[in-house]
């Protein structure tokens, strides 16, 4: 449920050019210090569904244009819950871990795929109606994370629920070095 909110000039209460120039002067040391650095941003499914999502995407595009290497890790819990509710499947959890049987997995795939497409589409439009309009942003992902099943724990079969086994750091780094934003889905 983490959001990184960036204060962009559009968000300022500045009424004068001198206020804008002061903002740029005040932020430029931070912009320069973090140029070429990798930022990992977590976007919960709540952020994707929020009315402010377009502004969040504009801020992500701005960070990218300032030379930041971005890895976006997104969630989809509310979208999954919505799909399960629509299919009359009762969600099952042990503690806070979803138990994903085959019927649930259909809803999970649909929700995660839809969330991913929404993020890619917003970023790929070049932030229409924003100062970042026309920016060429490439969003890449793939099978960069390998999972392993949780299996049966304390008598509970978690079916298709898993945890991270391996992350292909080298492939992620190559995509970042090539100027892409890396998008990682659950």
State the predicted function of each range.
Residues 71, 183-184:
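Hydrophobic/aromatic beta-strand patches that form the interior of the parallel beta-sheet core
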Residues 7-71, 177:
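N-terminal glycine-/serine-/threonine-rich phosphate-binding loop
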Residues 85-181:
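Ligand-binding beta-strand-loop-alpha-helix segment within the catalytic cores
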Residues 41-48, 155-158, 186:
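Short, basic, glycine/proline-bearing loop/turn elements
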Residues 78-80:
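Terminal amphipathic helices with adjacent charged low-complexity linkers/tails
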Residues 52-58, 82-91:
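Glycine-rich loop at the start of a catalytic domain that most often binds anionic cofactors/ligands
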Residues 75:
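Active-site glycine-centered loops adjacent to acidic/histidine catalytic or metal-binding residues
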Residues 1-6:
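Short, Lys/Arg-enriched N-terminal segments with co-localized hydrophobic residues
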